[in-house]
Amino acid sequence: MFVEALKRQNPALISAALSLWQQGKIAPDSWVIDVDQILENGKRQIETARLYGIELYLMTKQFGRNPWLAEKLLALGYSGIVAVDYKEARVMRRAGLPVAHQGHLVQIPCHQVADAVEQGTDVITVFTLDKAREVSAAAVKAGRIQSVLLKVYSDDDFLYPGQESGFVQHSLHEVVAEIKKLPGLHLAGLTHFPCLLWDEAAGKVLPTPNLHTLIQARDQLAKSGIAIEQLNAPSATSCTSLPLLAQYGVTHAEPGHALTGTIPANQQGDQPERIAMLWLSEISHHFRGDSYCYGGGYYRRGHAQHALVFSPENQKITETNLKTVDDSSIDYYLPLAGEFPVSSAVVFCFRTQIFVTRSDVVLVSGIQRGEPEIVGRYDSLGNSLEA
């Protein structure tokens, strides 16, 4: 999906990854991250967000819940980390990093609620009154006032399969009335997902019905004299979409893919955020005229289509196509069109969620100045690996 953008925006990353692979320093099934570029992307986002008065929570799941990288990004001015689930929150808290938002997309399990409250999570999203009561009880026990966000939806909204959740908008007044009765809770705001999506036909990011539902819910509360301080609208957050969010009065957003430049808007390599990671593999064998490279990092929603194959013998890079991958299979290997020498390196660049892969994550600094140096190795869940 992003091979052309990678070649255009960050050819130095390709060269660095291949050089480190040739030295035996990077194994197949590794996501190689250009640390300096991802920090530059983050800096640009923070600067843009400040121009429009929007706070940013840092989303880390796309780059493997990596605490080392998260700490560097937080130093740029992000308002904390949004933990997409309780396991990500655990990784970040163990690293001593601030989790600012928890409960969205995945609710906090009952026996983890108290810890989230006691650790000082800025806002906790709830989908049900039952979960709100659990948060209330934990807040009372901890002697704290816990801010919460309500996830809302309407019947015509777009919800990803497996993510169906929230309070239906027409019940919002009744829900808020119940929330107000719960001690230890402060209704801070509303959220929904996805609020923006890339439209291939239009060639740009557009608001979803979900964003309109979110705005209507805010206005509904305002008419009843209920003011909220946070209107959280995640999905497709980037330098080019932040002005659009500002037009709708959004106060908080949660960039993830834009940090690595792997947003659909960047397929041509023309966005402010530049490609900052690639996936490295290696040809294992041939079968019936095609080549098979080591798998482990394939993401079925990633729109992977093309790959660059590097032969050490002639130092030649050839572009080829990824053949159809059967969705019922385990990605032990990925099939590439044509025969290439065994043990050639393979470079992919596609939209991923590293935390659901088996990949290693290799952090490399100094790429843009021609002095690549590996500064960290982690697994896909943010655990440090031996050098």
Predicted regions and their residues:
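A charged N-terminal "starter" segment
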Residues: 1-107, 112, 381-387
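Glycine-rich tight-turn/loop motif centered on a GG-T
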Residues: 23-34, 118-124, 159-166, 201-208
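Conserved active-site and cofactor/substrate-binding residues in soluble primary-metabolism enzymes
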Residues: 33-40, 64, 68, 87, ...
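Aromatic/hydrophobic pocket-lining residues that form π-stacking "cages" and hydrophobic walls in ligand
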Residues: 45, 135, 214-217
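Active-site-proximal beta-alpha core segment in soluble small-molecule metabolic enzymes
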Residues: 57-188, 192-198
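Active-site loop/helix belt of alpha/beta enzymes
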Residues: 154-268
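Active-site loop ensemble at the mouth of alpha/beta enzyme cores that anchors a bound cofactor
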Residues: 237-317
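C-terminal accessory subdomain/extension
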Residues: 290-387
